[in-house]
């Protein structure tokens, strides 16, 4: 009998998360120089990190021997989101806070609801607690809130919602989300994952943090990995009622966000010009990519994120041909979409390189 046999059966049954292929890995496999590889697989900001955040990181290095103090970032998030500091939970990326929510509310004998084609971390977080995962059929490749409401059982403790959804980019109109909150049992936590919130057109965007006072069972999760360009530093946060935030903070590791991440995130929240430039680059890039997909006669899913998902036919073959040309995109067969690929919006030259490679791969 091995040590693995002593592990929890539901942990042994979990399939590990498969991230986008790193540039260095493709360079090793294909012998392609790193500088000739274009990675459009992980929804990272093609502009990199905010200049203000970079300066803050450089300044913070001098105090790296000290344990982190989350006060400044919590205060900045509270100011930005209009909540009190005791409603905020910081995480080592938003995946960390998603996992904290699962650990607080899920256990064997309980269940969580999520939508087909939704973010892979929801099943991981759920199944790692021994809880049952209830998957509901997608509607136009996104969430069907009516089906999700119908799937809630007496033992359900969490409903996972990504808005916009990853990997499909679908966006749920805010009135529909609020109407869903009105009918969900008050003892069921609704997790609203807004990793791509800043890519929603400003005229359409609603600050759902203001809803928490009306719906104490709502938890809003956001990240600095996308438009703020801090994916490698790993920092995100949850906004919740004081009661829920307190429970999450009880099991949170004491120093789960490092000094450099805290300094960068505080500065990034003040770099409004960088965020505006990133949004505009994404808007133009989305138009460029979609125009190319239409030119090739490829179906795509309308996206409110910094990526677009398109039907590639034999996606595995197309993906391999792209890799051989030094272009990395994201296969999403693991999300139940074996014929589709997801491409991150890059800079204008990166997008052009992708479209050129895709035309050759089709």
Curated annotation (Swiss-Prot):
Record carries keyword Transferase: yes
Cofactor: pyridoxal 5'-phosphate
GO molecular function, one term: histidinol-phosphate transaminase activity
Broad EC category: transferase
EC assignment: 2.6.1.9
N6-(pyridoxal phosphate)lysine modifications at: 226
Sorted UniProt keywords: Amino-acid biosynthesis, Aminotransferase, Histidine biosynthesis, Pyridoxal phosphate, Transferase
HAMAP family according to UniProt: HisC_aminotrans_2
Family classification: Belongs to the class-II pyridoxal-phosphate-dependent aminotransferase family. Histidinol-phosphate aminotransferase subfamily.
Protein name: Histidinol-phosphate aminotransferase 1
Gene source species: Dechloromonas aromatica (strain RCB)
């Amino acid at each position: 009998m091995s040590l693995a046999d002593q592990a929890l059966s539901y942990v042994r049954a979990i399939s590990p998360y498969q991230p986008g292929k790193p540039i260095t890995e493709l360079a090793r496999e294909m012998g392609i120089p790193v500088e000739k590889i274009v990675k459009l697989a992980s929804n990272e900001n093609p502009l990199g990190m905010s200049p203000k955040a970079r300066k803050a990181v450089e300044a913070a290095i001098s105090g790296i021997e000290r344990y982190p103090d989350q006060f400044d970032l919590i205060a900045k998030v509270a100011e930005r989101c209009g909540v009190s500091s005791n409603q905020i939970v910081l995480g080592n990326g938003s995946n960390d806070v998603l996992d904290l929510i699962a650990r607080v509310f899920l256990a064997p004998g309980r269940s969580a609801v999520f939508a087909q084609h939704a973010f892979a971390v929801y099943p991981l977080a759920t199944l790692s607690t021994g809880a049952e995962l209830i998957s509901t059929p997608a509607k136009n490749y996104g969430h069907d809130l009516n089906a999700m409401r119908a799937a809630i059982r007496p033992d359900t403790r969490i409903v996972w919602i990504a808005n916009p959804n990853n990997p499909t980019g679908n966006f749920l109109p805010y009135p529909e989300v609020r109407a869903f909150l009105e009918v969900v049992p008050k003892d069921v936590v609704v997790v609203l994952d807004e990793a791509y919130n800043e890519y929603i057109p400003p005229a359409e965007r609603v600050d759902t943090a203001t809803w928490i006072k009306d719906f104490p069972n709502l938890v809003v999760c956001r990240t600095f990995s996308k438009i703020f360009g801090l994916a490698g530093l790993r920092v995100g946060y949850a906004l919740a009622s004081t009661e829920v935030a307190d429970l999450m903070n009880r099991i949170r590791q004491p120093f789960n966000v490092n000094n450099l991440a805290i300094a960068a995130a505080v500065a990034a929240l003040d770099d409004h010009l960088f965020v505006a430039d990133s949004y505009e680059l994404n808007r133009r890039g989305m138009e460029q990519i979609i125009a190319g997909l239409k030119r090739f006669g490829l179906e795509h899913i309308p996206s409110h994120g910094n990526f677009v998902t398109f039907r590639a036919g034999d996606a595995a073959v197309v993906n391999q041909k792209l890799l051989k040309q030094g272009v990395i995109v994201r296969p999403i067969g693991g999300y139940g979409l074996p014929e589709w690929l997801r491409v991150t919006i890059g800079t204008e030259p990166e997008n052009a390189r992708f479209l050129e490679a895709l035309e050759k791969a089709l």
